[in-house]
Amino acid sequence: MSQILRRYPLLNDASAMYIHEKDNWTAFRWNATELTAILEEVNRKQGLLYGRLSSLGFDSKLKAMAENLTYDVVYSSEIEGIRLNVDEVRSSIARKLGIENVKQTAPSHYIDSVVAVMLDAVNHYDQILTKEKICAWQAAFFPTGFSEGSQIEVGQYRTNEEHIVSGMFGREKIHYIAPSPERVDEEMAHFLDWFNSQENISSVIRSAIAHFWFVSIHPFEDGNGRLARILSDMLLARADKSEFRFYNISSQINKDKNRYYNILEKAQHGDGDITEWIYWYANTLSVALDEAENIVSTILNKSFFWQKVSSVPLSQRQTDMLNLFLDGYEAKITSKTWASLAKCSKDTAIRDIQDLVDKDILREDIPGAKRPSYSIIYDPEDITVFFSDVTIEQQNGNHYIKAMYKGRLKVCERILPLDAERFEKGDLPLENLLAKYCSYLRIS
């Protein structure tokens, strides 16, 4: 546990309102017994994820990381109320990573700056973190020196008091008052010493502590939350010993922002026992790993498909449309949908689709239907013979296909709501559903 001692007096514990007002406040405590199960779950999921990723080639791994980083950047900003264009972020990341065949959308200078910060942290996870580095990252978030129309201090620690408030003007509620600006330099020196040190505790706990500690210091006038999430990711990367990042916590925090802020506030008003915060953080990370599994499944299924049809001649439009649906675009493949998305005539769409049917790349879901829809043929072999006990279940608002593969491997894959609905209605055959979500199991 952290044992950083102070060299100046603070309030006695009885009169302290915020955690940083207590003497030796960074000697955080937690109940290891209460955390054992969730930490084991996270470690198990990390192992499974990286085990699956071992079957991917370098290019596929790079694409998986790019997709993860895209949503990390987007959702970390959205937590702070900043909406970024997903295509611009994806394009910026792809260009910086040297990934081809990604829709090119010219990103703004701001998005390029934010992406550069994330990639710097990811690519140099094992380097010493310095005051100069973290100040440069904060400055990159605010290239104009303004935030929400107000000029702020950038590239340096704050020199003003920092109050975390909510509510209308005149009716503000103060949630937290950060350490005084006179303390920030020394507080951050203590934090950076700890961050760069080696400590024999769980990487998940270290990541959670870094997040909590940094936002509690609140060293900058703005950008603290985004930086805290980057720093916690860096510690996870150090533990993984890999610059490849395939999961992030930002997307899950964004779905539960109120709980995120409430549990931070509770810990910041506490006595140094941050068990509840660490548990919430680890549980949120566990959900993030589930999300990463879904992304990896999509990439593996897509890779399996293109291996099968690599020698089949296709037009660029057909390739682009197939990639769109392989990436999980939620719509039935019909001539109307095809024409709309490909921006071509319906007659052209019909010819494209019929050509793919003739080449055994698409097949009708219900042969002879008045308004035909189609599914991608991932594998010409009927893979239903390899599965038993297939069910569609709903959990926490998501739909999953569950089955037993070859009588020995339990499979659970999240599926699109539209596919679940179509399957229940009988519009989507089981063979097509299993092929779409479970073909990766056929990779030898």
What are these regions (language model features)?
Residues M1-Y400, C412, L428-L434, Y440-S444:
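FIC/Doc superfamily catalytic core
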